[in-house]
């Protein structure tokens, strides 16, 4: 049957509409072009803004800040919500980096594709506003970037201080090369300086079928080279979810620098539109001002006067310089952010005045100070250079420990080296060390609630050291004198002078047996390997000490050695374990909590490492998340004093008093009220 002609267009229209409905939404091509950014609709944060002449300025020269600019709407990179197939995309942009010096800049910038425009957790400096030290490389970042980096950062395995890299979820590039391009005529590689203050054009192309990323760059006046600078297969489907935002990120460090984008184009499933070079705004260029004739006359006279004045001041200056001289070596550049100037520490402690002296530890004196710039209270420990390991390795370990961040750890802020001394800078703890609170007659007796909170806090800090940080940190000297109390009487584990670091999943190395008698696990006498289990043993002794108000090893009235673990175990066998709680509490304690602490302390003190609970279990027991198994006193059938003698610790007791450690006490990093 033939339809009447008037109805034919309507039928055809319905047919095309029906076919159009079958076309997936993901096939819609996204395309935009910005020849300059005047009036451009972009999303900004940080320092990013558009200048009066249309430049997208990501950073304005302010130190240690970041800037981001994004196309405001998310783009669909996967071909459909239930598909992992990726769409191809292409982008072209012109950038420029203007530093204070032609051959030196302050970190770089990056083209980015991100799941979210919110990068508030990212850090400036070497992190370029993309990630931070904790999440660098995490798959949950969902971040793809092409970086233009002007600083060599060894922590990211950078190849040079002038390179281009392809980044996935972090700043350890999956592919990188020195900035430059391949000449189409000769095939020779032409170097480019990212900090030349000249505009550079960049093309980034991704093939959704082959998963190949090509990055090409050239000076603005050079046509696009045929051979890309970088070419890498990258499975972006595992990085980018269905939709993502495209834009730019940059950050500054300690030097003056501005990062600019002059123009930008983007297209999904096709070549990015060519930018109109003649329409792009110009980069600011700093030219030296012509010297005036007046300056030519005045300058020689002023120079002569200045030389005389400088000569008069040199003697005073040199004396002050010698006074505040420090020992610095080239390898310490890596640890720069963790280094304090001796001058600041000198003024902070009033010239290391005796009035500021908190105490004298095993390695040196400890002073209370107030940093002149931040007014923060600190404890400064002056340590003599030891020979137990190379200074470079020692400083590296100090800096590594300085990166620990937990509310129940004393923060190591940094260090300074000078004339045979190493100065360590810590947070100041106003309420002193726990052992002083437990044993000093003039102190008010700690309430049970305070003791239980301190025990749980130190356990939380120990879990962070053992399992939650990037490396395993074995403390090796857990005891009451190494637990400091902040202004709110929260316990913070400190003194990492004996601590050892090793990677998760590896075995600790054999070392000299060091620590404090009464806290040393029995197996250390024959294995020499400090481990998480030996730390748990020391923590068990610590729990008993806090609950009972007695030292792990002491002398009775008849000069007999009394081991706290054995005494508590005897009382448990007699059915009176809570009778061991500190009598100064006069019975004012929660019996269930005290029983838990005492029984858990005994369980941690088991002579077999495998019978002790893991650190996470220990925290779960103390927090009440998991009940402590019902154990009879016969399960702990041992005599700790006999075990210590069997393991050969008696000579060690003679060398290291029971109330001190081979590394000196950390309690001097605090002061009582």
From Swiss-Prot:
Q: What is its EC number?
A: 2.7.11.1
Q: Which reaction does it catalyse?
A: L-seryl-[protein] + ATP = O-phospho-L-seryl-[protein] + ADP + H(+); L-threonyl-[protein] + ATP = O-phospho-L-threonyl-[protein] + ADP + H(+)
Report, as the record phrases it, the tissue specificity of this protein.
Mainly expressed in root epidermal cells.
Localization: Cell membrane
Membrane topology category: Single-pass type I membrane protein
Say if the entry is tagged with keyword Lipid biosynthesis.
Answer: no
Instruction: Please give the start and end residues of each transmembrane region.
Output: 297-317
Induction / repression: Induced by salt stress.
Cite the Gene3D superfamilies for this sequence. 2.60.120.200, Phosphorylase Kinase, domain 1, Transferase(Phosphotransferase) domain 1
GO terms (molecular function) for this protein are: ATP binding; carbohydrate binding; protein serine kinase activity; transmembrane receptor protein serine/threonine kinase activity
**Where, in residue ranges, is this chain on the Cytoplasmic side?**
318-673
Residue span, Protein kinase domain = 352-631
Paired cysteines (S-S): none
**Which PROSITE patterns does the record match to this protein?**
PROTEIN_KINASE_ATP, PROTEIN_KINASE_DOM, PROTEIN_KINASE_ST
Topological domains annotated Extracellular: 28-296
The signal peptide annotation in the UniProt record is 1-27
Entry GO terms, CC: plasma membrane
- Catalytic site: 477 (proton acceptor)
Under the heading SUPFAM superfamilies, the entry gives: Concanavalin A-like lectins/glucanases (SSF49899), Protein kinase-like (PK-like) (SSF56112)
Q: Does the keyword Metal-binding apply?
A: no
Legume-lectin like, as annotated region: 32-270
Binding of ATP: at which residues? 358-366, 381
In its miscellaneous comment, the UniProt entry states: The gain-of-function mutant sit2-D (T-DNA tagging) exhibits reduced tolerance to salt stress.
Role, per record: Lectin-domain containing receptor kinase involved in salt stress response. Acts as a negative regulator of salt tolerance.
> Which family does the entry's similarity section mention?
In the C-terminal section; belongs to the protein kinase superfamily. Ser/Thr protein kinase family. In the N-terminal section; belongs to the leguminous lectin family.
By what name is this protein known? L-type lectin-domain containing receptor kinase SIT2
Recorded source organism is Oryza sativa subsp. japonica
């Amino acid at each position: 049957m033939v339809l009447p002609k008037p109805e034919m267009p309507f039928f055809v229209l319905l047919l095309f509409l029906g076919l159009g409905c079958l076309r997936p939404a993901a096939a819609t091509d996204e395309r935009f072009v910005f020849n300059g950014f005047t009036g451009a609709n972009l999303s900004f944060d940080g320092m990013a803004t558009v200048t009066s002449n249309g430049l997208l300025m990501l950073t304005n020269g302010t130190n240690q800040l970041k800037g981001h600019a994004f196309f405001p709407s998310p783009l669909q990179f996967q071909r459909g919500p239930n598909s992992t197939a990726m769409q191809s995309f292409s982008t072209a942009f012109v950038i420029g980096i203007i530093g204070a010096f032609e051959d030196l800049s302050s970190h770089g910038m990056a083209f980015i594709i991100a799941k979210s425009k919110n990068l508030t957790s990212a850090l400036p400096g070497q992190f370029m506003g993309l990630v931070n030290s904790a999440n660098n490389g995490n798959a949950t970042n969902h971040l793809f970037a092409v970086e233009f980096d002007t600083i060599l950062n060894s922590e990211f395995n950078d190849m040079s201080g002038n390179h281009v890299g392809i980044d996935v979820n972090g700043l350890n590039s999956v592919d990188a090369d020195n900035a430059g391009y391949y000449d189409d005529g000769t095939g020779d590689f032409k170097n480019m300086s990212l900090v030349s203050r000249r505009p550079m054009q960049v093309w980034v192309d991704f093939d959704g079928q082959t998963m190949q990323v090509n990055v090409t760059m050239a000076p603005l006046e050079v046509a696009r080279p045929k051979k890309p600078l970088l070419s890498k297969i990258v499975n972006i489907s595992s990085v980018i979810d269905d939709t993502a935002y495209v834009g730019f990120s940059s950050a500054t460090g300690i030097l003056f620098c501005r990062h600019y984008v002059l123009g930008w184009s983007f297209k999904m499933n096709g070549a990015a539109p060519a930018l109109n070079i003649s329409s792009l705004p110009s980069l600011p260029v700093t030219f030296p001002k012509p010297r005036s004739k007046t300056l030519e006359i005045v300058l020689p006279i002023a120079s002569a006067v200045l030389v005389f004045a400088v000569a008069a001041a040199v003697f005073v200056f040199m004396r002050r310089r010698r006074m505040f001289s420090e020992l610095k070596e080239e390898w310490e550049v890596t640890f720069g952010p963790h280094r304090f100037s001796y001058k600041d520490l000198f003024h902070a402690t009033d010239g290391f005045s005796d009035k500021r002296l908190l105490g004298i530890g095993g390695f040196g004196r400890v002073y209370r100070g107030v940093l002149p710039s931040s007014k923060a209270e600190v404890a400064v420990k002056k340590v003599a250079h030891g020979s137990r390991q190379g200074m470079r390795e020692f400083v590296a370990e100090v800096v590594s420990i300085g990166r620990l961040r937990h509310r129940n750890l004393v923060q190591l802020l940094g260090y300074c080296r000078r004339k045979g001394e190493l100065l360590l800078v810590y947070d100041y703890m106003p309420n002193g060390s726990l052992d002083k609170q437990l044993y000093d007659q003039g102190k008010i007796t700690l309430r049970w609630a305070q003791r239980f909170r301190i025990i749980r806090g130190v356990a939380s800090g120990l879990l962070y050291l053992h399992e939650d940080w990037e490396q395993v940190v074995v403390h090796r000297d857990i005891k009451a004198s190494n637990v400091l109390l902040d202004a709110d009487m929260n316990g913070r584990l400190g003194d990492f002078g004996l601590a050892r670091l090793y990677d998760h999943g590896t075995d600790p190395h054999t070392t000299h047996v060091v620590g404090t008698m009464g806290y040393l696990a029995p197996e250390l006498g024959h294995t020499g390997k400090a481990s998480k289990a030996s730390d748990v043993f020391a923590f068990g002794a610590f729990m008993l000490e806090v609950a009972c108000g007695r030292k792990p090893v002491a002398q009775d009235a008849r000069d007999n050695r009394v081991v706290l673990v054995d005494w508590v175990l005897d009382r448990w066998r007699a059915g009176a374990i809570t009778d061991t709680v500190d009598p100064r509490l006069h019975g004012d304690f929660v019996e269930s909590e005290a029983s838990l602490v005492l029984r858990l302390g005994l369980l941690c003190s088991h002579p077999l490492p495998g019978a002790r609970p893991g650190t996470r279990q220990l925290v779960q027991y103390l927090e009440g998340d998991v009940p402590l198994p019902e154990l009879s006193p016969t399960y702990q059938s041992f005599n700790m004093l006999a075990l210590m003698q069997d393991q050969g610790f008696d000579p060690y007791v003679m060398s290291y008093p029971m109330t001190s450690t081979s590394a000196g006490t950390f309690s001097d990093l605090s002061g009582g009220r």
